Amino acid sequence: MIQKQHESKLEVGQTFPVTIKRLGINGEGVGYFKRQVVFIPGALPGEEVVAETTKIQRGFAEAKVKKVRKASPHRVKAPCPVYEECGGCQLQHLDYKEQLNQKRDIVVQAFEKYMKNSMEEKIRPTLGMENPWHYRNKSQLQVGRKDEKVITGLYKQNSHQLIDIAHCMIQHKATNEATKVVRRILEKLNVSIYNEKKQKGLVRTIVTRTAVQTGEVQVTLITTKEELPNKEQFIAEVQKQMPAVKSIMQNVNWRKTSVIFGDKTFKLAGKEVIQETLGDLSFELSARAFFQLNPEQTVVLYNEAKKAAALTGNEKIVDAYCGVGTIGLWLANDAAEVRGMDVIPEAIADARKNAKRHGFTNTKYEAGKAEQWLPKWVKEGWRPDVIVVDPPRTGCDDKLLETILKVKPKQVVYVSCNPSSLARDVQALMKSYEVEYVQPVDMFPHTAHVENVVKLTLK
C-alpha cells in the first residue's frame, strides 16, 4: 500500500492528463492529479490539458501546458506578441468578461478558506473597464543591447534574458511613446548602456510616467553614475521629439540590485513634478512619488470606498495606511474630520501638502502606526465613526485589528489589494462586525490582481 501511494506522486518531467478546476490567486490553472494539487500557468478552468511537471514542492506540483485537449470557450488569442515570455500579464488568453467572473471567483475562494459560512451571496460582480487596454500611467523598463541595437523591456522570469517590449499593450500610449523616443535618442547618441551580466555601462532603466488628465509626461533615466555624456543634446532631442515631456529627471543607482531607484534624484530639464488630477483633486508627481497606476479605475475604487463609508457630513474618519492622503482627501468634503497616519514620514509630509493645497482644514496627518495613535486620540476624547484601511499586500497588522475591535467604530471600510490577507483580516473583525458586502474592482486588467472594497458594520 505504501509503495502504491509513492508511485502516484508526480515526478519532474512527467507528462499527465489533468482537468482544470479553477484559477489560482496568481492566475494559474489549478487541477488535481491523483489527489495532488498542480498549478499550471496558462491553463483555464474547464480545460482538459496534457501537462508536464516542472517542479515538485511540498504539498503541490508546478507544471506547464504541453497540449490543450479541450479548450475553454473563453480562451482567446493573446494580442501581445511577447505575452508568454514577458510575464507582466497572466490572463490575456482569457476573454475579458470572463476575467471579471474569475476574479470574483478568486475572492470567493479566498473567503471560503477562512470562513465557516459561505460569503458568496455578499460578493458582488467585479467592476471592470470599458476599454481594458493601455491603462497603466507608469512604465519602468530595463535597457539593454541586442545585435548592437538599444532595446527596452523586462527580464524573462528567473533569467538574465531581456525581453524586448517595443509596445506594451497595458501601458498608456504616452508612456510607450516616451520610452520609444528615449531609446531611439540613446542609440543615436551612442550612450553607454548597462550590461547586467558584466555589470558595466551607464543607462540601466527608463522610467516614464504620464499624467493622464493633463497630458504631461515625465522621463527619468536611471544611471550607474552622475555623468551623462551628450547631456544637452539628449535633453534637446527629447524635448524636440516629444513636446509633452515636461520633466526630465535622472536617478543614480550604482548598486548591484534589482531595486530600480537609487538614493539620488535630480532634474535635468523642465519641472521637478508633473500635474495630475483625480476627480476634483490635483496631485504633483515627483519621479519617486507613489501614485495609483490606473487612474480611471482608482476613481471607481475610491467612489466605492466613499459609498461604503455612507457619510452624512458629521463623521470622524481615520484613514489608516493613508500614504499621500488620497483616500482620506476623497472623503474629506463629506466628513467632519479626517485623521490619517502612515509609517513613512515622507508620505505624511506629502499628505499634509496635498491637504493644504486643496484648502482642507478638517484633516490631520501623523507619522506612525494607527495602533499607536488611535488609543491616544480615544483617551483625549476623540473617537472615530469610520475607519478606512488600505494596507499593503500583507494585510493589516494584528495590533491594528485588535485596536479596531477595542475602539469599535460604527463602520470599517477595508480597501484591499490581496484577497487572501483580506479574508483573513475580515474573519478576525467578524468578532464584532458584520460584512455588508464585498465589492471586487479590476484595477489591473489581464493580470491576476483584484482589489476589493469591503463594508463592515458594527453588530
Curated annotation (Swiss-Prot):
Its EC number is 2.1.1.-. InterPro entries: MeTrfase_TrmA_AS, MeTrfase_TrmA_CS, NA-bd_OB-fold, SAM-dependent_MTases_sf, TRAM_dom, U5_MeTrfase_fam. Transmembrane segments: none annotated. [4Fe-4S] cluster binds at C80, C86, C89, C168. The keyword Heme does not apply. The active site is at C417 (nucleophile). Keywords: 4Fe-4S, Iron, Iron-sulfur, Metal-binding, Methyltransferase, S-adenosyl-L-methionine, Transferase. Residues 9-67 form the TRAM domain. Belongs to the class I-like SAM-binding methyltransferase superfamily. RNA M5U methyltransferase family. This is Uncharacterized RNA methyltransferase BA_0426/GBAA_0426/BAS0414.
